[in-house]
From Swiss-Prot:
Binding-site list for a fatty acid: 110, 130-132
Protein's organism: Caenorhabditis elegans
One GO location term (cellular component): nucleus
UniProt similarity note: Belongs to the calycin superfamily. Fatty-acid binding protein (FABP) family.
Protein name as annotated: Fatty acid-binding protein homolog 6
Length: 135
């Protein structure tokens, strides 16, 4: 089931993304730049190792993980968090746990809805929704 996510996805719609970035502590200049991007998300799997690569004109990022195993993650804006990604009920659930007291925790959920990949990003009371289609 999770294999259906593999491929390249182009962002077509975004709601509340700048508000989400503000909630998790992303700086103003980075927020403004990132809010206007239309990145491509590439999801790959090799054995039990998953890759989530994001490409944009601003920055390219790579995240690799094994489902259910906690790992150290450096977010695109440079924050360090403890993360774990699980696959439950047809959804990838990515939990970012804060390390410093000043940081915020976040939950990123991805699922397929028709021909779209839907991503929600939640922190505190802020929820962002982003929609992607296959390239």
């Amino acid at each position: 089931m999770s294999q259906e996510f593999v491929g390249r996805w182009k962002l077509i719609h975004s709601e509340n993304f700048e508000e989400y970035m503000k909630e998790v502590g992303v700086g103003l200049i980075t927020r403004k730049a990132a809010a206007n991007l239309k990145p491509t998300l590439e999801i790959k799997v090799e054995g039990d190792l998953w890759y989530s690569n994001q490409y944009s004109t601003f920055k390219n990022t790579t995240l690799s993980f094994k489902l259910g195993q906690e790992f150290d993650e450096t977010t695109p804006d440079g924050r360090t968090v403890k993360s774990v990604v699980n696959f439950e009920n047809g959804k990838f659930i990515h939990i970012q746990k804060k390390i410093k007291d000043s940081d915020k925790e976040s939950i990123i959920t991805r699922w397929l809805e028709g021909d779209k990949l839907i991503t929600t990003l939640e922190s505190g009371s802020v929820v962002s929704r982003r929609e992607y289609v296959r390239e």
